[in-house]
Every structure is written in C-alpha cells, then in structure tokens.
C-alpha cells in the first residue's frame, strides 16, 4: 500500500510538472535565445560580461532545462569540495553530465563556479555555444600545438578562481563500467598546483541519448530522474605532485569506479 501511494504521488508530481510546461517552455526559449546572443557578444566585447553575470545566466538556464526534463540532482558529500579553484575529475555517461555538474556546483554554497574542458567537435552545438559564456576550453586532440595553447588557457582559468572539470575517459562510456582514464587530463593540476576532486555521477546513463546508440551499446537507459553527484575526497597537490600522472589517474579511476558500483547497487 505504501509503495502504491508513493507511486501515485510521483505520478501526480510529474503530471503537475508536465502541466507547468505550458508556462515554462516559452520562458526557456526566451532564456535560450538570450544566452546564445550573450555568448556571441561575449566573444566580441568580453568586458561587458563579468563572470558573476555569465555564470548566473547559464546556471538559471540549466536549472530550467533540468526542471523541464524532470531531473532532480542529489548532492552527496558537498563538504569535500575545497572553497577554491580545483580540477574536478568525473566519469562520463551522458550529454547531460555537464548540465548536472553546473547545477550541483551552482546549488552548493561556497564552492567556486565551474567550467569544462571539451573536445573541439562540440563547440558548434547549441549547448556548447552557451558554454562559451562560462569560458569552456575546447581542445583539438589532433593538434598538438593547439593542445599546448589550451593548457595555458586552463591554467589561467584556474588562476582566476574557477573550478575546471575534465572527463578523462575522453568520451561518453555507455557501460556499467568506467572507461580508462587518460593521464594527460590531469596535467593542469600538476602545472597549477591545485587539488584534484574525484567526482562520481550516478544515474545519468542514456539520458539525451538515441535509442539506436543505446541498442548498439547493448545497455539500458538509467531509470528514473534522480541523478546523484558524489564528491569524493580531494587529493591535495602536495600528495600527488611527485607521483607519475598515470598512477594518479589510475588511483582516481579506482575510487570513482568503486563509488559508482556502490551507488548503483543502492
């Protein structure tokens, strides 16, 4: 009886959310257009767009998008995030992951704003056009000179007090396993001497993914709309700076893999 009542309440809540879309969707479209215009103008006249305004605009847009999708972000261990610039290292299961993390950082008090490292192929999508508002770093993995230049850009962002997130698997991994971590993703933490925060995302796999791709990967979409963001214990630079980056990447991979397996079972 209790389960039936809970299911009914969830149904009612979702129904009310769908009903509210009549009002919310036009607002979202207007906010999206405004953000795209701001992103284009920011490239031309950056001095007119201070960070606090840009990050807040993106956070509000993302929050509304997740509301429309019916996604609830649950944060675990927020006290593990240092109140300063860090390198966030996360697993990657969905195109929704960056939005989930923007929401998680935006609603966690005292933590720095967050931006991302992304592959250059994504920079012309509507989502990552907006990400330019938060200084997303695009890298061309086929161009060594551009990658070297982007490393300086990453360090500059961290020096400005912004947290930087990287997905060291390099792509979305549609599997119940965590893909191999590439050690080069940690290089900026060594150069900028900042903490590494391992972060585990659970529940996002298959969201914003085509059925064809899911069938090809032979996996099912995560059920439900509750997505957990687990902040693991940060690693201070003094504890990894003299250690080979591949060993550090392996240790971070192990911790995220264990956390992912644990929360998938709960």
From Swiss-Prot:
User: Which keywords are on file for this protein?
Assistant: Acyltransferase, Lipid biosynthesis, Lipid metabolism, Phospholipid biosynthesis, Phospholipid metabolism, Transferase
Q: Give GO MF terms, alphabetically.
A: 1-acylglycerol-3-phosphate O-acyltransferase activity
Q: Which reaction does it catalyse?
A: a 1-acyl-sn-glycero-3-phosphate + an acyl-CoA = a 1,2-diacyl-sn-glycero-3-phosphate + CoA
One Pfam family for this entry, by name? Acyltransferase
Which EC number applies? 2.3.1.51
Q: Which GO terms describe its cellular component?
A: membrane
For this chain the motif HXXXXD motif maps to 92-97
Q: In which pathway does it act?
A: Phospholipid metabolism; CDP-diacylglycerol biosynthesis; CDP-diacylglycerol from sn-glycerol 3-phosphate: step 2/3
The record's comment on protein family reads:
Belongs to the 1-acyl-sn-glycerol-3-phosphate acyltransferase family.
Annotated protein name in UniProt = Probable 1-acyl-sn-glycerol-3-phosphate acyltransferase
Source organism (scientific name): Mycoplasma pneumoniae (strain ATCC 29342 / M129 / Subtype 1)
């Amino acid at each position: 009886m209790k389960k039936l009542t809970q299911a009914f309440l969830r149904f009612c809540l979702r129904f009310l959310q769908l009903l509210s879309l009549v009002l919310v969707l036009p607002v979202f479209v207007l906010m999206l257009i405004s953000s795209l215009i701001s992103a284009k103008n920011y490239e031309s006249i950056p001095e007119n767009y201070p960070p606090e305004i840009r990050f807040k605009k993106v956070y509000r847009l993302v929050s509304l998008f997740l509301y429309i999708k019916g996604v609830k972000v649950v944060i675990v261990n927020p006290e593990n995030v240092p109140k300063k610039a860090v390198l966030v290292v996360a697993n990657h299961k969905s195109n929704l992951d960056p939005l989930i993390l923007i929401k998680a950082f935006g609603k966690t008090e005292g933590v720095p704003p967050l931006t991302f490292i992304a592959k250059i192929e994504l920079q012309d999508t509507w989502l990552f056009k907006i990400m330019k508002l938060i200084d997303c770093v695009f890298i061309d993995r086929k161009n060594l000179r551009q990658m070297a230049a982007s490393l300086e850009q990453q360090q500059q962002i961290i020096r400005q007090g912004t947290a930087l997130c990287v997905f060291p698997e390099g792509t979305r991994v549609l599997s119940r396993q965590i893909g191999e971590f590439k050690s080069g993703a940690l290089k900026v933490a060594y150069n900028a001497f900042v903490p590494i925060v391992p972060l585990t995302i659970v529940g996002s796999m298959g969201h914003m993914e085509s059925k064809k791709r899911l069938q090809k990967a032979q996996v099912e979409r995560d059920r439900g709309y509750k997505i957990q963001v687990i902040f693991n214990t940060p690693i201070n630079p003094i504890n990894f700076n003299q250690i080979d980056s591949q060993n550090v990447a392996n240790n971070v991979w192990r911790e995220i893999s264990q956390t992912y397996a644990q929360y998938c079972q709960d």
